[in-house]
C-alpha cells in the first residue's frame, strides 16, 4: 500500500497539487450546482417563486446539519487513513474506513427520525413564517428520507479522495449533480410537483451517487477496500477520527446555527424579503467556499501523507502553494461580486424587488470575501496534520465567539438594522482571519520543528 501511494511523497508538489486539486475543485463546482440548482429553479416558479425560495432557505439549516454530520466522521477519518497509509499501515486504514461507514449509517438513521418527528417545529425555529412554512415542510418532508444517501455519499467520497483518486471523487459528484439538474425541471415544472419535485430529484440523485461510491470502494481499483469484517471491528478506531473531524463538524454545523440566527433576525427587521435575500447570499457564499474547500481537499492527501512520513519540507511547500492558490481565487471572486452583484443574484430570482434588495445586501455580506483564502488554508492544514484542538479553536472563534454575537450586536450600533445584520459577516471574517493567522504561524512552526527533530 505504501508503494501504491508513494507518489504523494515523491512527485513535485507543484505538479501534484493540480493533479489532485483540479478534479476536486471541478467536483466542488458541480457540487455547488447540486446544492443550488433547486434554488435556481424554485426561484423562477411563476407567481410563488419568491416565497418558495424563502421556504427552501429556511430548510438550509437542516440540510447543513446533515452535511455536517457526514463531515463529523469522514473529515477526520480520511486524514487518519492517509496518515496510516503514509506509515505503511494498510490494515488500520481499511478498518478506519469500515468503522466510519458504520458510524455514518447510525447517525443518518437518528437524523432522519428527528427531522420527520419535529419537522415543523424545527422549521419555525429556523425562521419559517406562516407564508413560507408550507413550502419548507413540503421540501423537508421528502429530503429527510434521503439522509442516509447524503451521509454515505459525502462521507465515503472523502476516503476516495484521500487515496489520491481525485477523478473518481469528481465523478461521484458529477453523476449526482447532472442527474439532479436533469430531473429538477421534470419534477418541478413538467409534473407540477413544485418544491416536492425538487426534493425528490435531490434524493434520487444522491441515491445513485451513493451506489457509485460503494461499488468503487468494494471493487478492485481502490487501495482501501470496504470489507464486512471491518464494519464493526473498525469502530474502535473512530474516536480519534471524530476528535479530528470535530472542527470541520463545528465549522459546518455552526453554519446551521448561524443560518437560524440570520433568518430570525432578518425576519424580525426586514420580513420575508430579507430572509429570501439571505437564501441568495448564502448561495453565492457557497460559490466562494466550495472551490476553496476543493483545493484544500486536494492538498490534504499530500500534507497528511508527508506529515505521516516525516517529510517537513514537503509539508511546508504544500501549505505555501495551497495558500497562494486560495488567496488568488478569493480575491478574484470578491472583485467580481463587488462589480457585478446583479448577475449573481439574477441566477436565483426573477422578482425585480427581490433582485434589487439582494444586490445591495450582497456587497455588504461579501465585503471580506477576499481574505477567505487565509482562513481555509490554515484551518484545513491543521486538520491535515492532525492538530484537532487547534482546528476546533479556530472554527469556534469565527462562528460562535464572533459571528453569532455580532448578528445581534450590529443592529444595536447601526440605524439600518437589516444592513447591520448582513454586515456581521464581513466584520467577523476580518477578526477571525487575524486570530487564525497568528495561531497558525505559531503552531505550524512547532509542528515542523518536531518533525525535523525526529
Task: For each feature predicted by the language model, list its residue ranges.
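Hydrophobic/aromatic residues in alpha-helical transmembrane segments
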Residues: 22, 38, 77, 118-119, ...
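Small-residue-rich hydrophobic transmembrane alpha-helices
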Residues: 53-113, 150-169, 277-335, 339-341, ...
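Helix-loop interface residues and adjacent transmembrane-helix termini in multi-pass membrane transporters
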Residues: 33-36, 44, 50, 84-87, ...
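Transmembrane helix-bundle signature of multi-pass secondary active exporters and lipid flippases
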Residues: 25-79, 143-150, 239-306, 326-334, ...
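Transmembrane alpha-helical segments of integral membrane proteins
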Residues: 402-411
